[in-house]
């Protein structure tokens, strides 16, 4: 939901909130347009705001649904911050975001899996990390398993990252060994 000149505070930049409500809508609709031109069977988005100070309280998931009306969709909340008071002069604020998965095939089920996160102070930047597994039935009786993943990007340590990758790998391997197709 950010324009190219946005410099995100977590990457050493200065911005925590989009420039305007219009810039959020422009960015989301632009991303949707770029993706739709590819005519994908599946789409996986991360950092999709359901509500948030940083995105002027625009429900980006609903905005994407309005652009991909022929797709079934699902979301899993992966960030729910009551209020992040940083940066001091333009706080990130209250935000709730998700992983959003879209499919041109009907989804049979979806599961949200919570990932291990840091227990240190950095966990305020890393709330609710997860992945979602969407299951789509296949004609041979197996399932196509779509994994939409958002691992720890900031804070944490190697042990947390290894734990996240191990959990993800184990779930993917279980699906694969069951004869399912894993993406």
Language model segments and positions:
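Short Pro/Gly-enriched beta-strand edge/turn motifs at strand-loop
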Residues: 83-85, 112-119
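His/acidic metal-ligating clusters that form di-metal
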Residues: 130-147, 159-183
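Conserved beta strand-loop-helix elements of the APE1-like EEP
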Residues: 65-69, 93-110, 137
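Short hydrophobic/aromatic beta-strand or adjacent loop that forms the aromatic wall/cage
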Residues: 96-99, 127-133
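Active-site-proximal beta-strand/loop segments in catalytic clefts of secreted hydrolases
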Residues: 1, 46-48, 76-79, 105, ...
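N-terminal, active-site-proximal structural segment of metallo-dependent hydrolase catalytic domains
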Residues: 1-96, 142
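Surface-exposed cleft-lining segments at the edges of enzyme active sites
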Residues: 14-20, 48-52, 115-124, 150-159
């Amino acid at each position: 939901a950010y324009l190219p000149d946005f410099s995100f505070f977590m990457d050493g930049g200065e911005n925590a909130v989009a420039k305007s409500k219009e810039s959020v809508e422009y960015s989301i609709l632009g991303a949707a347009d770029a993706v739709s031109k590819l005519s994908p069977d599946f789409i996986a988005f991360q950092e999709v705001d359901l509500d948030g100070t940083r995105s002027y309280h625009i429900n980006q998931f609903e905005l994407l649904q309005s652009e991909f009306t022929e797709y079934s969709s699902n979301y899993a909340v992966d960030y729910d911050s009551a209020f992040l008071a940083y940066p001091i002069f333009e706080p990130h604020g209250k935000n709730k975001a998700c992983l959003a998965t879209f499919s041109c095939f009907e989804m049979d089920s979806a599961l949200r899996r919570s990932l291990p996160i840091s227990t240190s102070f950095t966990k305020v930047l890393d709330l609710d990390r997860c992945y979602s597994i969407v299951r789509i039935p296949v004609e041979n009786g197996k399932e196509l398993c779509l994994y939409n993943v958002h691992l720890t990007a900031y804070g944490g340590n190697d042990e947390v990252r290894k734990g996240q990758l191990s959990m993800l790998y184990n779930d993917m391997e279980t699906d694969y060994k069951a004869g399912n197709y894993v993406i």
